[in-house]
Curated annotation (Swiss-Prot):
Keywords: Chaperone, Cytoplasm. GO terms for molecular function: ATP binding; metal ion binding; protein folding chaperone; protein-folding chaperone binding; unfolded protein binding. It comes from Paraburkholderia phymatum (strain DSM 17167 / CIP 108236 / LMG 21445 / STM815). This is Co-chaperonin GroES. The keyword Cell membrane does not apply. The gene is groES.
Length: 96
């Protein structure tokens, strides 16, 4: 991937959502909602404080994160659909 996010932006790849419910019902692609979880692929250097020093981001590459359904901007890179979002659009990091 040849993307380097700027400032406090993060590149996220959506994780595939289950296509079957717990009771075994198969959910067709047309009815399935976009997943709200993803894996962080790249992070920017962070915002700058009043003195110009960078403020590091709380998320790092490889983190599994939760975000809003409409968070970020969708981009296609090398045939992969990715999200570019600000760190503030990420609601939580999922602990493994």
């Amino acid at each position: 991937m040849n993307l380097r996010p700027l400032h406090d932006r993060v590149i996220v790849k959506r994780l595939d959502q289950e296509t079957k419910t717990a009771s075994g019902i198969v959910i067709p692609d047309a009815a399935a909602e976009k997943p709200d979880q993803g894996e962080v692929l790249a992070v920017g250097p962070g915002k700058r404080d009043d003195k110009g020093a960078p403020i590091a981001l709380d998320v790092k590459v490889g983190d599994r994160v939760l975000f809003g359904k409409y968070a970020g901007q969708t981009v296609k890179v090398d045939g992969n659909e990715l999200l570019v979002m600000r760190e503030e659009d990420i609601m939580a990091v999922v602990n493994k």
